[in-house]
Amino acid sequence: MSIFNDYKDRAEFLTVYVREAHPTDEWQMKSNIKDDVCYAQPRNLSDRLAIANDFTKRYKYPVPFGVDDMNNAANDAYAAWPERLYIIDENGKIAYRGGNGPFKYYPSEVRAWLAARYGEVRHPEAKPAEPKAAEAKPEQKKG
């Protein structure tokens, strides 16, 4: 299960889209081509919003989503590029500042902080599905 699904009733979540990490007109990555995530660096807020909207629709992204302004205020305030995780407590203080992604990006640390604060979310083990009548194996004749 996702961290968001596990803790959305106890904590507020927000994703902020900052400047494009691997735009086609700067530092395109092969993985972007493979995943069909190819955008030029947005030059205005409308372009940035269009990319964010495409992402949220394409991936059915459930987390509330914000978009940094073209002065990159959120990116500058939080050193967010290319990706970074933060926890801001109820007093507006930074309670957790993750490392810059992708190499120091550890969602497991966010989960651990949330678990310590709100309690660990346990998921019951998935039980194997019972076979349907048509799927049941016929009894073998003894004999």
Residue ranges and their predicted role:
Residues 1-59:
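Structural microenvironment flanking redox-active thiols in thiol-disulfide oxidoreductases
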Residues 16, 66-68:
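Conserved beta-strand termini and adjacent loop/short-helix elements that scaffold enzyme active sites
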Residues 42-43, 63, 70:
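Gly/Pro-rich cap/lid or specificity-loop segments adjacent to the active site
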Residues 52-55, 62-63, 122-130:
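C-terminal, non-catalytic tails of nucleotide-sugar-dependent glycosyltransferases
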Residues 69-143:
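Thiol-/selenol-based redox modules, centered on thioredoxin-like
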